[in-house]
């Protein structure tokens, strides 16, 4: 990955300069150029789509800082000018993917799949976007809880107790497409244990690196689902019900699901699926 940053971002911007002549201003200028997308370009192979952004720029500065630190230890230069660089601010915690970013993210997911990225991780990420579920709810999901034809999942325990949570057909299709492992109750089983899959964050980081998207965490996927629901003009109460924040979706002691939530889950997950697949 460091080699990729060097060839894609550092060398095009600073490759003609002598290492002894580089200043803090040069490196901060490089960072600004990467943020602005000056080094953005398509590329073949596992690297996928290369763009700019604050995260890409910060990582490039970190790579250059390490290189120049090594040069300092070897006596090639007296001082590491990258050590004093002020990194650009990271994305706020309320980050969510815009419609354009969702399309770009979908492209990166397809590129990752073509590059033999972990299929369980990719499926877990897709389901998170299609449902707005928390990371723990996604990874701990068990087949016996899923009622795809009826449009809901019956969680025996969540942050607010047992819940029936609405899902759309696109989410149900994603779940149904997962191969069952004999003896495992999990929709997303672990690679080497009886537990569930745990590598979702690492897969997400690699997909985001391909897409050039910064500050994207599993919680951002949850925010994105809520944001799309808002753009489709669903009420705050309905969105809270979809996310499991409010008791609206559960009545009569965990045996009835509000039909309005099923309709909303269908529309939101279909819209997100279309954007991911390049149709929306």
Segments the model singles out, each with a brief description of its role:
Residues 65-68, 72, 258:
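C-terminal flanking helix
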Residues 36, 40-62, 73-135, 139-140, ...:
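Basic, Lys/Arg- and aromatic-enriched nucleic-acid-binding interface segment
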Residues 89, 96, 154-161, 236, ...:
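Catalytic-site neighborhood detector that most strongly recognizes the C-terminal catalytic loop/helix
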Residues 1-48, 67-69:
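Basic/aromatic-enriched alpha-helical hairpins
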